[in-house]
Amino acid sequence: MDERFYDAYQRIWELPRTGEVRVQMGQESAFKKNLFGAIRDLGLDRDHHRITNRGLYKKFHEGLIEIAETHGTDLTEDELRGHFQTKKSGIFSNWLGTPPDTYKLVFPIMIRSKHFPDEVELYESKAEQIDEDQWENHLIAAENDDDSSFDSFLDELPNDYSDHPLKRREWTFLMVEMKARDEFYALHRVSELVEIRFAEINFFDQLWAAGMPQPGSSDRAPYEKWTRHQEPPFYLIFQDGDFVTYRPMDFDYRRSVGRFHFNHADDVDEISDIPTFDYDADKGTYEGYIVSALLAYQDGITERSVRQSFFSFWRGIEILSNTSDYSNASDFDKMVDRGEFALSYHHDMDDSLRPELKRAIEEIEEKRHELVHEGLKTEIHQGHRNGAKLLLDGLLLLYIDKYGQWDLNDMSSFLKHGVEYQEKVQFLTTLLTDLS
């Protein structure tokens, strides 16, 4: 038995007046530190067992309290060892030795239901629309739970709701089922799947959008077409029909997020056709490159700060440009060149680029050299961010188009030789222009 389990046990006492057995007041932090430390060193595979350390903490916390209730709070370490091993074996056999439970997570997203399919794949699960009556039943169950602060949480939400919270046409209500051994794993896994799915949806919906240029004489903030829809404001978690807990997820939930609309709202059925990728794919694989770049794209497309948005897109370009070393000027050039080639590959080698797209690319070409010399201190404005997004658009679409057909070596070779071909074409075009 890890001595930290005994240290945690020693911080349990029996209240003199009520006889309640609990962790001593003022000892909660030390109790938690010891218990979590011992649990982490058990080395259980989170995804294999579909558990979290937090779920294990809850089980072992309950187990130590039960031992203290049955055998007292003054056992020696040797006396505790036998009782603890019995309790630990029970936890492992009765909990880890049986199939995981099914948890149901319901949540709102700020998209009109008519713009969202009835069902969307989430790699290992699916998100299904529920109607307003079903949503209201779940909402009431959470509001009426005496042990939950959800009712107070709802009062803090900023959006202009109708008479009943969240009951309005701008919202879609979704339900996802997830196999898990504790509610924390269910929440963790579903939030991962929702994050990558929204990254995929946002990517295809915002493809080739470059934003609107800021008028030179105006102090007005530029109109942005990009979405802030990064994750639901909260999840409600249920098991066997009973409300378990809620979890706020969008940590800007107190700030009004306004309405969200798809650029391609008429193409709602196409959302179901958008490919899904494994959130847990090895980062060194072709699929892992796509997932990492999609998450960088999601950060960029939902980030308010132009500067932070730019560097999120830039991180995606670094991943997909497939260069070996980003610390020198030549590889910064490779990153931009390969991004430009991927972009032009989808636009008939530059002939069909809209004027605002060309301006954005010119901005990023100028910025690449400052990034080498000034690094993170360099000034970033909207045009640079737009250019970085477009380069990532081109690279991501190319990777997704060739998914299942090419490997990383194939892609690297295509980008390398594509840039060389493009440079030769540009050289010949310039030469012929000069001669004429």
Regions found by a protein language model. Name each.
Residues 1-93, 326-328, 340-342, 352-367, ...:
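Polyanionic, low-complexity intrinsically disordered segments
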Residues 286, 299-303, 350, 354-357, ...:
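Residues at structural and domain junctions
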Residues 307-313, 322-342:
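Short acidic alpha-helical/loop segments enriched in Asp/Glu that coordinate divalent cations
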Residues 347:
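Acidic, metal/cofactor-coordinating or nucleic-acid-engaging core segments within structured domains
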